[in-house]
Amino acid sequence: MVVELKNIEKIYENGFHALKGVNLELKKGDILGVIGYSGAGKSTLIRLINCLERPSSGEVLVNGVNLLNLKPKELQKARQKIGMIFQHFNLLSAKNVFENVAFALEIARWEKTKIKSRVHELLELVGLEDKVHFYPKQLSGGQKQRVAIARSLANCPNLLLCDEATSALDSKTTHSILTLLSGIQKKFDLSIVFITHQIEVVKELCNQMCVISSGEIVERGSVEEIFANPKHAVTKELLGIKNEHADQKSQDIYRIVFLGEHLDEPIISNLIRRFKIDVSIISGNIEELTTKDIGYLVVRFLGSVAEIQRALEYLNALGLQVEKLKD
């Protein structure tokens, strides 16, 4: 495991219980989206991973080492394998792009002869080789975040922490940053923890996700699994799943989830031909995830109880998720 959080509790001096019994693992090469509402404990969680904050109790293991047991110099060395980017970039306004990236190498005591080539390599990686002498005030928000990404990769980390790294950006720039991070992850086989309140970020970038609410992890799994079958009420809210059809007169209203292999199949047509029922489609949409697409239909079944039951058994036999929206 690249990251292991064990029985983490975080209680501030004012008595606020920010994290409660948190256990979390991150495997090599995984991109974990941590999502939740404001104040849920997301930023506290990510700051514990590199010990910017220390837990009240529990263990923080990164690359197999409990960071809480390290002396200051040992912790500083361990942090070189942990890159971090922030919502507001945290660039030094008095230094140009080259100097901002070089600063991370200087702190790590790189040889001066190697710093120049490494900085140019990083700036080429993030598409800013033509902005070497620009200062932060001359850059757009997306360009500033690219500088921050280059700086975070300076010491060749195997773990990248992203704290709301796209929430200050517009949707087009967010997409470009996520595309960049995805390419970097594949190139260097990085593990990434991405804190966000934007469900679109999880859909576009992550293969794993966890949902945090009031300091507790309430749901954890692959993005595909959770989008297909969310269990916790907070997860359903974040995914935009609401029982908006509760006022419909018919009781036989269902939500059907189609995974990638079923999206192109005429399942509803087959259902009508096989069974003595009519199917009214109320709503539908498709979510494009990093692993596969997932489709959703909200339908009303019209027919006898026995025929509707047979139709439901048929859908279940196909491996589809079927949820009754009204009893």
UniProtKB/Swiss-Prot annotation:
Q: What protein name is recorded for this chain?
A: Methionine import ATP-binding protein MetN
What's the source species for this entry?
Helicobacter pylori (strain J99 / ATCC 700824) (Campylobacter pylori J99)
Q: Does the entry feature the keyword Metal-binding, yes or no?
A: no
Q: Name one GO cellular component term.
A: plasma membrane
User: What quaternary arrangement does the UniProt entry report?
Assistant: The complex is composed of two ATP-binding proteins (MetN), two transmembrane proteins (MetI) and a solute-binding protein (MetQ).
User: What molecular functions are annotated in GO for this chain?
Assistant: ABC-type D-methionine transporter activity; ATP binding; ATP hydrolysis activity
Q: Which UniProt keywords apply?
A: Amino-acid transport, ATP-binding, Cell inner membrane, Cell membrane, Membrane, Nucleotide-binding, Translocase, Transport
Q: Which family does it belong to?
A: Belongs to the ABC transporter superfamily. Methionine importer (TC 3.A.1.24) family.
Question: Where is the protein situated, by its record's location annotation?
Answer: Cell inner membrane
